[in-house]
Amino acid sequence: MSTTAVKENEPVLAAPKPEDLAAVLIAKNRPQRPSALSTSVTFGWRAMLKIKHVPEQLFDVTAFPIMMTLMFTYLFGGALSGSPTEYLQFLLPGIMASSILMITMYTGISVNTDIEKGVFDRFRTLPIWRPSAMVGYLLGDMLRYLIASVVILGVGLIMGFRPGGGVGGVAAAILLLLAFSFAFSWIWTMFGLLLRSEKSVMGVSMMVLFPLTFLSNIYVDPKTMPGWLQAFVDVNPVTHVVAAVRSMMSGDWDGGEITWVLIAGGVILAIFGTLTMRLYNRK
């Protein structure tokens, strides 16, 4: 005897008629396909919710920049510039740029993690703009970059940083840095798709970012370096980014450096954005 009891008065659902199914399938009034902007914003919101549910991932965005600012200002400020306060005026824009560029690698790590979980298999079946998933990651990470900028600036102001460019110069410098970081993050999305594990993505990212950030004009003036090292520092893209941000915050806008950063960001976006989407479509 079956263990499932059947109620005598329970209504029996009739099977749908073939003509009714056909009418639904061929109906012309179908839901409108979401726009590229709406899907990108949706995926960006998804990335922000990850931060909400795992707030400890903001440790690198907040604690690390504060530690670097305090350590370099008070340990080396007197020896390098005569006083910690004077050195802070030179150091803080560089610390802000290096901290944000360093945390761009987490975009690639997030992409690689979702691939390993199989989330992208579902994304690729959706009738949406294909790059929106990648763009969403970057939009969500823009919140990280903004938080890092505000934290570093706040600590700097408490320590005695006084930007000559005022509020407008600081805001413009942060916007330029965020725009370049958005383009720069596409490098790590490519590695997130290309490499097999998140540890590999982190290893490659650190191998690239550490030389770029430390062999630059962030901590000292390149004029004090040996000639062979100065030659590398002068062509280092981080050097140009820091120089542009530093000039805007000080009020002495360097049009050449700002233009260089904008053009370099566009080139990086065009190259690595294209490579990322090709890998994504073949993954």
Question: What role is predicted for each listed range?
Answer:
Residues 16-17, 22-64:
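Aromatic- and glycine-rich beta-strand/loop motifs that create alpha-glucan
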Residues 3-9, 15-21, 26-27, 69-73, ...:
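Alpha-helical transmembrane segments of multi-pass membrane transporters/translocases
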Residues 55, 74-84, 212:
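Short, hydrophobic transmembrane alpha-helix segments
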